[in-house]
Design a protein with these regions (language model features):
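Membrane-proximal intrinsically disordered regions of secretory-pathway and membrane-system proteins
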Residues: 1-197
Length: 197
């Protein structure tokens, strides 16, 4: 099994709903508000970054070498929800993002054995080590947005999503998931690849 978060997104390629694709951002507004509600309190609570519980993980790994299972469950669920919303907004699927888990968008996490497989000192330097990954990730995100715009035009005019563009957009999402797993969720000590593959 990989030591990185694996991303599985089943893309709807054919028979796409042109009408919902045309107004996708507006249709996604309610679930975007729901998703953003997790980060609303992030400014007032130390250790919360974008809704993810980070400081409790850092402290528990540093002092006890334990990753609290309830924090892991929350962070997993929030990242999966974020991925379902991203898949919908980026026109990869016509299925409205469920606030519960589904099989269209699935993330597979590395086994951490309650934190025993993780170095207790790595959380202190991971954020610094991840800076080049974030910078490259911004370039990849722009690339994915350009591909999504082209694919969106294809969906609303022809009713299908080009396979090549879908694969590349999913690779960018997977890249960000690996980065989040390393630097934010702290579920791996293995440095993520700079490659999209």
């Amino acid at each position: 099994m990989s030591n990185q978060i694996l991303t599985e997104i089943h893309v709807d390629l054919d028979n796409r709903d042109k009408n919902t694709a045309l107004f996708r951002v507006f249709l996604a507004f309610p679930v975007l508000i729901f998703l953003s509600s997790f980060s609303e309190f992030a400014d007032n609570l130390p250790g919360v970054i974008g809704g993810f519980l980070v400081l409790p993980v850092v402290l528990s790994l540093l002092f006890r070498n334990v990753y609290p299972s309830y924090v892991l469950a929350f962070n997993k669920a929030l990242l999966e929800l974020s991925n379902r919303v991203s898949a919908y907004v980026l026109v990869l699927t016509d299925e409205y993002p469920s606030i519960e888990a589904n099989q269209k968008v699935r993330l597979i996490y590395p086994e951490i054995e309650g934190g025993k497989k993780l170095s207790p000192w790595m959380p202190l330097v991971k954020w610094f080590l991840a800076i080049p990954l974030y910078l490259l990730g911004i370039v990849y995100a722009i690339y994915a947005l350009i591909l999504t715009f082209i694919a969106w035009l294809t969906v609303i005019t022809k009713g299908h999503y080009p396979v090549e563009r879908a694969e590349e957009v999913v690779k960018v999402i997977a890249y960000w998931n690996r980065l989040y797993g390393y630097a934010l969720l702290l579920v791996t000590d293995e440095y993520p690849s700079f490659s999209l593959n």
